[in-house]
Amino acid sequence: MRKILVTNALPYANGDLHLGHMLGYIQSDIWVRFQKLQGNQCIFVCGSDTHGTPIMLKAKSLGITPEELVTKYSNRHLQDFTDFEINFDNYHSTHNSLNKEIVEDIYNKLNNKNLISKKAIAQAYDPEAKMFLPDRFVKGTCPKCKAEDQYGDSCEVCGATYDPTELINPRSVISGQSPIQKNSEHFFFDLPALEKNIKDWIESNTLLQPEVANKLAEWFEQGLQSWDISRDAPYFGFAIPGTNEQKFFYVWLDAPMGYIASFKDYCNKNNINFGDFWGDSSSESELYHFIGKDIIYFHALFWPAILSSTGYKTPTSVFANGFLTVNGKKMSKSRGTFIQARTYLDNLEPSYLRYYFASRLTSRIDDIDLNLEEFVTKSNSDIVGKVVNIASRCAGFIYKKFDATLSGEIFDPELESEFSKNHDAITQAFEKREFAHAVRLIMALADKANQFIDYHKPWQLAKEEGQEQKVHQVCSQGINMFKVLIAYLKPIIPSIVAEAERFLNIQFISWADAPKFLINHKIDKFKPLATRIEKEKVDKILEDTKKMFENEQAPQSKKEEPKLDIAAECTFDDFMKVDLRIAKITEASHVEGADKLLKLILDLGGVTKQVFAGIKSAYKPEDLIGKHTIMVANLAPRKMKFGMSEGMVLAAGDGKGIYILEPHEGAQPGMRVK
């Protein structure tokens, strides 16, 4: 039995949850439920992130205390999680004496190791609001990629981190005024001193997502900087000891420690030894943090550094998920697609969204699109039309004609074996968080079950004299195939499975038993387990969302919707001049002095070409060797200061990532792409 501790990013307690939040929590909940069915001791903790200037200012605007604000939203968050069937073992808060004790203890340990220093720095100060501005209360143009409307600590376009004072054309989010600079003494964590600790953690982490590893390599190349862990009063949070409550711990220092506090609280309530799960690195337990891709910096750099230097186990891995779009676009209040969790729950059952997200989720950090038309179609087709329909087609015959008892024989052992043989592949897919693959395997089995029923037509057999035994066996096999499918789906749609368990008179408590057929087993009367989604329900969600936000103040400047910038039209003859070929990457290496380039040696089926490709931020050289890609083979050679580039590899990009093109299996080096 494995000992596994899972955390999910703490939601910020100054607003309601939306479906973008739910994507990450549903992902982790599915994985945790699967681990528990495997018989592992898996503990799932979370809590509310409750500190910082945004909470302080929002509470002030509402005429309530910050404590009242965070209590209100913490309760609402927990209710949303509960109704979405996110089954935390403990839900805590960062604003309590236990977390304060942990934060101060870790700070003192860091300070005793000379990892904390003080220095005066220029801070953004709002002269109108008469206060220092936290990072997220300054916006401007990114100093690295020049993207506009970026926060004062990091760019959401290029991922760069910086100080608010480095922003181009900065403005205060509070007053809209240009901030001035004032000096203030701040406390810094010496991150560069722990670079080896972080790199050792990365090297030992076999489960780290490639995208995370690549981003970390990029940050190391840029050089680590000491981290400002303090904020000036006024601030809602924990005061730094010895500062007379004039300096406070930055929210991103105490927020991850909320994971420790939540788990300690759980241990205290359940008489569990904290050290068995989160002791030093020698512990045999596993620790996983599920997070959004926008907070990788804090969880994969600062957090392992802090833990490794204060006697705590470092994460076994950090799993990041992408963002959510709706109908191919960023969630929008005006279009009604900025859907809050409660708005969805007021109109639809959580199982449908849990299933849809599972059908799209992989182990990669891909953004997920909630296509509402596809959402309706997939829910109706897969859950209702394929899975639940199997039971509804067979249960009546068993209940009425055979005393609600399944047959003592298996009608089609070969088909039964196929359901059983897929168990290992489905297990591996769940373990590796390849939920979309697991769903595809399960639905392929559902198709086979429905084909079996369609072929034997028990409704016709029931009308034929002497076919009673066959009707019994066919329908029993149908119910058993339904039983296997529903067991495989338990981590994804637990409430529907709970209803199915009542109908089947069993409880799935062991993943190993999922593929086993029931023999001479008595079932209950079948009742509908899921109903079809009507388009009107989805339309109402959009309308409810529009109404919710229609009274909000319109933004100061409206951004244009992104448009597909198609290049000038070319003729077919022009296009045919471009010679695209399959190429195998035989060598890949860094280019000394180049920030973005990798040197590739490409085999075109006997012909070798050298290419310099601007893909360094997305790929490690060793990960590219042996891959096939597509290159422009007849591009005129170009002399660069690093050498001669004899072509170009094809890649796609959206400003956030780079993705080289890979042909399907079977394509060989030198083949022409037409």
UniProtKB/Swiss-Prot annotation:
Domain tRNA-binding: 574-674
GO biological process: methionyl-tRNA aminoacylation
UniProt cofactor note: Binds 1 zinc ion per subunit.
PROSITE patterns associated with the record: AA_TRNA_LIGASE_I (PS00178), TRBD (PS50886)
Subunit structure: Homodimer.
UniProt-recorded name of the protein: Methionine--tRNA ligase
Cofactor list: Zn(2+)
Entry annotated with the keyword Cell inner membrane: no
Entry's Gene Ontology molecular function annotations: ATP binding; metal ion binding; methionine-tRNA ligase activity; tRNA binding
Stated role: Is required not only for elongation of protein synthesis but also for the initiation of all mRNA translation through initiator tRNA(fMet) aminoacylation.
Species, as recorded: Francisella tularensis subsp. holarctica (strain FTNF002-00 / FTA)
Residue numbers covered by motif 'HIGH' region: 11-21
Name of the gene encoding the protein in the UniProt record: metG
